[in-house]
Amino acid sequence: MRKPPIISEPSNKEKKNILFLIASIGGGGAERVGTRLVSEFSKNHNVYLMYFNFKEKTFPISPNVHLIPFFVTNELKKEFYPKVKDSNLIRILEIEKVRRRYNIDITISFLFSPNIYNIKAGGGGIKILSERNDPEGKGDSYFKEMALAYEKADKVVFQTNYVKNKFASEIKKKGVIIPNPICVSCLADKIPKKKIVAVGRLVPQKNHELLIKSFAIFHKIHKEYYLNIYGIGPLLDQLKILVYDLGIQNYVNFKGFCDDVHEKIKDAEIFVLSSNFEGMPNALMEAMMMGLPCISTNCSSIPEIIDNEKNGILVEKDDVSGLARAMLRLSEDEILREKIRRNAMRKSEEWRLNKIVSKWEELFY
């Protein structure tokens, strides 16, 4: 385990001591974005990454980043008991110690609990909180608690105007729009296979039921196509039953989780996102950057990513026949696919890592 060196003062006036708070360094899209950003920040700043949950699989991180894992174990609780019984308070007290020890200038946090810790912990210089979700899917209590935290923050980073505009004017004034940085390992094949793909957790939010029902209609006309779904989740068995009930079990494949998903989907003809709500979906943006023609439900912030009929096709939520028609259009119109592919790649230039890092660094001074 790497131990961070004590730095009493930045060696360079322009360098900042930055503490980054996140739940873990493995798992979901927010964690992947967070680890990618801190690795870039560490090229110009002293960066400390504090995380609170253990994950077996972790995302790659630059060796320049000083890792500070802090897991509240039963043994650790005994050290604080009976004065402190709350695990969250133990984390907050540790954040305060880290801020003092490393003379932190800026503290950045991702996701709900780290955002709360950032605000409640003393010290830490400039406090930048980042909203990574659409509050619509999180409930009223989540929204109210985050709004209270944002009121106390110095800056709040939103991924989209759609989410930013849900908050009061005082919060919007300190809000900044910075999309996710997107990186892909390969581009789409020039000659695709008869394949439709989707990438996402098998949970109600992603609404794979809509996708499967639409594909069943589409498949009656184009029997040569296959649907590959990448992702794991609690709805797997339920979705498999639906596939069998629709009689398309030989044409729908549940591929599970894979590290090299870009390589797996690059030969597809169409990418589909069928979600009920989204923050800023990395899977869709990565598919666009690869040059895959994309269809998405018209939900949450998606219209800020897809300009309908130009760089993708939008369909309404839960519109089974509408999604089937969109699949038919793209599969049968090569000129439309090429136009959408080209415009999607042009749009994705906005999400290049160097551009996103520059926007973040503007907040540091």
Map each language-model feature to its residues:
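N-terminal strand-loop element at the rim of the active site
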Residues: 2-7, 11, 20-28, 32-36, ...
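A conserved mid-protein helix/loop that constitutes part of the nucleotide-sugar donor-binding site
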Residues: 31-36, 194, 198-220, 229, ...
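Short His-centered aromatic/hydrophobic patch
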Residues: 91, 109-115, 131
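Carbohydrate-associated surface elements
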Residues: 162, 181
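Nucleotide-activated donor-binding/catalytic signature segment of Leloir-type glycosyltransferases, i.e.
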Residues: 240-256
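Aromatic "clamp/platform" in nucleotide-sugar-dependent glycosyltransferases that forms part
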Residues: 257, 276
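Conserved acidic donor-binding segment of nucleotide-sugar-dependent glycosyltransferases
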Residues: 308-309, 313-320, 329-334, 349
